Structure formats: C-alpha cells, structure tokens
Amino acid sequence: MSRDLDSRFSFREVAAVNEWLMTKSKAIHAMRDNPAHRIGLLGASWGTDLTKDNGRGRWKKTWEKMFQDPETFADRSSKGPDQEILQEYVWRTWGKRSSVQHDSFFCEKFTGSIGFPTQRLIEKNNYVAAVWNDGEILKKKCPKPCRRYPDWIHC
C-alpha cells in the first residue's frame, strides 16, 4: 500500500482494499475518492499485490525502465513527481489493465472503475487519502453512475 504519512486508514478504505484483495487477477488497486482525484493512479492511495497478474515481473521491468531514464528522478523541486512517474511507468503501460479501481467521482472517465463498497459518512476526513489534521468534510454528491447503490448520494 502507498499512502501519504499525513493520512490515516479509514473503515471505508479497509473495505475497498479487502474487496480488491478478494479478486484473483488484478495486481493494482487504485482509489479515487475526492473530486480532486483526477488521475489514474494517485501517489497517496494505491496498492499492489506482487502475486497477481505477474505483478512481480511487471514491477521489475518498471523499475528497470525508470532507472534507465535520467529524467525520472531529475527534478525533485516540483510537487507531485511521484504521480507523474506512476502515470508514465505504471498506469499507462500496464497498471490500468491490471487494476481494480474504486472511484467516487470519475467512474465514467476511468472505464471499469466501481463504486466504493461503503457509503461515505458525513464526518471529518471522510475520504481516502484525507489529511488527518485538516478536518475536511467532503459533502459533494457523487454522480449517479459512480454510486454502488442509487440511494447513496454521498458514495
């Protein structure tokens, strides 16, 4: 699992991870749970299982390509290079095809994504990868196609 150190695991996240772990063939788990989560693989909310879909072999090749590219780690002054690296070397090459994707807002953009297995509670830090001491409360309604159940307006 990859998480930012300033976020905490939630019941919602645990339920989504458990659902992914029950799949037999998808090496990557991607979670997008906020309107700001607009890219395929966020640096703060993904996981991998090396035993699924040749995950170990795919990651080995990914790391080899990354280390051969002098640009991969050249610019450390910008925010978010981890996400750019994940998009280029993992998501676009093999991660998208070998993933379970939980998505609350962009399920139509990310084909094959599914809604979260739990309904969002209206409380502080109520989305995956929330910064724990911000106390943000996400109240935005999610689009109907992203809802696991039609009556879950805060999915």
Please name every model-derived segment:
Residues 5-7, 90:
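Short, flexible loop/turn elements at secondary-structure junctions
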Residues 7-42:
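Conserved donor-nucleotide/metal-binding helix-loop-beta segment in metal-dependent transferases, i.e.
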